Each structure stands twice: as C-alpha cells, then as structure tokens.
UniProtKB/Swiss-Prot annotation:
Highest taxon listed in the record's lineage: Eukaryota
Pathway: Polyketide biosynthesis
Protein name: Asperlin biosynthesis cluster protein I
Biased composition range(s): Low complexity: 105-116
Function summary: Part of the gene cluster that mediates the biosynthesis of asperlin, a polyketide showing anti-inflammatory, antitumor and antibiotic activities. The first step of the asperlin biosynthesis is the production of the intermediate 2,4,6-octatrienoic acid by the highly redusing polyketide synthase alnA with cleavage of the PKS product by the esterase alnB. 2,4,6-octatrienoic acid is further converted to asperlin via several steps involving the remaining enzymes from the cluster.
Disruption phenotype: Fully eliminates the production of asperlin.
Region (Disordered) residue spans: 97-124
Species lineage: Eukaryota, Fungi, Dikarya, Ascomycota, Pezizomycotina
Organism: Emericella nidulans (strain FGSC A4 / ATCC 38163 / CBS 112.46 / NRRL 194 / M139) (Aspergillus nidulans)
Length: 219
C-alpha cells in the first residue's frame, strides 16, 4: 500500500485514500493493477472539481499527498511501459522521478528487461511490472496484440491522471489570479492548461505525466 509522510486531509481525503490504498509497496506488481486505477482517479478528479464550490483557498483543491501519489502512479506506468516494450527504458526513466525495471514473472512469462537499471532518485527500490495473461474471449493475446492492449490501458490511466492534475493546477491558478495582480509576464492560459510554465509541484508533476503520455499515444 502506498504510504505518505502525511495523512490525507481536507476535501476529497476519502477519495485520495481510496486511490492510495490500491497501490502496492515498491517492488513487483501485476499489470492487472492498472485497470483498477482509472475509475478511482476519475472519482477523485470529480471531487476536486466539486470542491471549488465550497473552498475559497488554493489548498482546498490540492489534498495533502496528491503529488507524491501521482508520482507513484507515474512510476508504476513507467514500469508497465518497460515491461511491454512500449517505450525505450531510458525514455521511461527520463520522464519521471527515477527509472523503472522489470523482472520475470512467477508464471514464467518473460518480460522485457531494462538496460541501465538504476535506483530511483529517492534511493528506494522501484516498482517492477509483472506481465499478466491477457485474453479476449477464449483467445490469449500475445506479442503485438498484448502490447497494443497494454498501451491502451496505460494510456487510459495516464489520461485520467493528467486530467486530475490539470484540474488541480487550473483551480489553483484561478485562485491565484483572483488574489494577486498578474503583470505582463504572468502565466498565460495555455501554460495554465498544460502546466509547462508553472513552478509548482503540481505543474511539474503534470509535465512529467504529459511527457510519458506523449510517448505512448495509441496508433
């Protein structure tokens, strides 16, 4: 289970806890985890969107622990990308806080290894995606078909995660614009939407998510 140094507080703490409870400790995890993340991420995003109706401060839009949680999900997606060969291992490592690696599954289904494996920037172990059998009716998917489905699943998770972070970032920018005088050098609407120019933790995390998302757009 994902753990944070601080307990989730404020609006949407329940939804944040629901997402965090799905994440395993760092180490091997099964790919089947990823499809379970999409709906809870969407629920959290909807909750944060609704929080603007009752909260008058930027802190009300960003529950405690949101960015560490998002970074963890990003690393899990990076590990999945490496396992299924969706992106080059070095690329996956370069868009996040650390590299992801992979190990053979207990069932003997081979998984792509990561070259240049190294620990994450925090010094902790990384997540390693273990392939799980994928079926379509009675047909077991293999090779390109398997990778295609994996790509679609990872893409869905990253899309939900980016929508969540974008919602938080835009709401925070809205609050700041109402309380501060923005000069000619202020952040424009485009930067607010995509989080490329902001200096905050949310915008930086969003940029990392979008970087990986852009690498795995389904063909």
């Amino acid at each position: 289970m994902f753990s944070s140094t601080r307990r989730a507080e404020g609006p949407c703490a329940t939804e944040l806890t629901q997402v965090s409870s799905l994440l395993p400790p760092r180490g091997p995890y099964e790919f089947s985890l990823l499809p379970t993340l999409t709906r809870p991420l969407e629920d959290l995003s909807k909750c944060i969107e609704g929080a603007r109706q009752t909260s008058a401060t930027a802190n009300g839009y960003s529950p405690t622990g949101l960015v560490p949680l998002a970074d963890s999900i990003l690393e899990i997606c990076q590990a999945a990308c490496t396992a299924y060969g969706l992106v080059d291992g070095a690329i996956a490592a370069g868009v996040g806080t650390g590299s992801s690696d992979n190990s053979p599954t207990a069932t003997g289904i081979g998984a792509a290894g990561l070259t240049g494996d190294r620990p994450s920037s925090s010094g902790a172990s990384t997540w390693r995606c273990v392939k799980t059998p994928m079926t379509l009716g009675s047909l077991t998917l293999q090779n390109e078909e398997e990778s295609l489905l994996a790509r679609q699943i990872v893409y869905a998770v990253l899309t939900s995660l980016s929508a969540l972070l974008r919602e938080v970032y835009v709401r925070e920018k809205d609050v700041v614009s109402e309380t501060d005088v923005v000069g000619e050098g202020g952040v424009g609407a485009g930067a607010a939407l995509y989080g490329r120019e902001g200096a905050g933790a949310v915008s930086q995390c969003l940029s990392r998510v979008l970087a990986l998302l852009g690498k795995i757009v389904p063909e």
